[in-house]
Design a protein with these regions (language model features):
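Hydrophobic transmembrane alpha-helices and immediately adjacent juxtamembrane helices
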Residues: 2-284
Length: 284
């Protein structure tokens, strides 16, 4: 056989599956699957929008009432609405991450995914992307209605909004990693943990009031949480018109620690689930 007719050596199938392009393709395929599920069911999309809309309207009307009776509330116009919108960024992103994972269990598909070429890191990346998609589906209409009803434009915060958004998203992913890891290890008996974990932080993160409002012994706990700095930063902008950059730096530093800890926890729970055989029993 001449060199011109000799067939070129083909890459190993294993090597083909480990390329960056193959990894990106698996992530994109999983994200596309989740997107089709959302797009094909209007009740799912309506559910994503419902609670953020109700919260925004409730706090917005309360703020309008207080502004008529209090000079401080009039000065702080947009404080409650901004706080509830940012809080919902954290909540919707974490739930978007966790619920996408739970849907794999409910459909008894998790074991198939774990036996496929899909790597755990790729699965996590897909869940992160899906959480962003669900967040946009939920919050874009609500933010528009906040401007329509109350004249509050979240984009008027400028660069500060980008910093707030990024820090809350990273924190939501950290919570999502821990909550899904717990469900991996202990099964659907721990499902409520995935739904409730973010709300544990609501009174401690000082969403609607400053850190100084908390008891002295609880303030260090609040200051150890990244969202606290986000909401303190929001109050600084609304009340003083100043963007306090060092608050965002502290939030980012804490987020790095929490995200690494969440990743380690997820890897540990996944390994434990494989050892104890709970992966194949999910959904049964």
């Amino acid at each position: 056989m001449t060199p011109s007719t000799a067939s070129a050596p083909r890459a190993s199938p294993v090597r083909e599956q480990t390329t960056v392009a193959a990894s990106a393709g698996r992530i994109f395929g999983l994200v596309l699957r989740y997107w089709y599920v959302i797009r094909s069911s209007w009740p799912r999309a309506a559910e994503l929008i419902y609670w953020p809309l109700v919260q925004m309207l409730m706090w917005g009307f309360l703020q309008s009432y207080l502004a008529q009776a209090s000079s401080f509330a009039a000065k702080a116009a947009g404080l409650f609405i901004g706080a509830v919108l940012l809080w919902d960024v954290l909540v919707r992103s974490q739930l978007g991450f966790s619920v996408a994972f739970l849907e794999e269990i409910w459909s008894r598909n998790l074991g198939h995914l774990m036996m496929s070429p899909l790597r755990p890191a790729e699965f996590i990346a897909a869940l992160m992307a899906v959480s962003l998609i669900k967040l946009l589906v939920a919050m874009v209409p609500v933010a528009f209605l906040a401007y329509f009803f109350f004249g509050f434009n979240v984009l008027s915060l400028g660069f500060a909004f980008a910093a707030f958004f990024a820090n809350l998203i990273i924190m939501s992913w950290s919570l999502g990693l821990v909550s899904t890891g717990v469900v991996l290890r202990w099964g659907l008996g721990a499902e409520s943990f995935a739904w409730l974990i973010v709300f544990v932080f609501l009174p401690i993160c000082c969403v609607y009031y400053p850190v100084a409002t908390l008891p002295g012994w609880l303030q260090p706990v609040a200051l150890a949480l990244p969202p606290t700095y986000v909401f303190e930063g929001l109050r600084a902008i609304v009340l003083e018109g100043a963007f306090v950059g060092h608050l965002m730096v502290k939030a980012l530093a804490l987020n790095v620690v929490y995200f690494i800890a969440g990743s380690i926890a997820f890897a540990y729970f996944l390994r434990s689930a494989r050892i104890h055989g709970t992966l194949v029993q999910m959904g049964e």
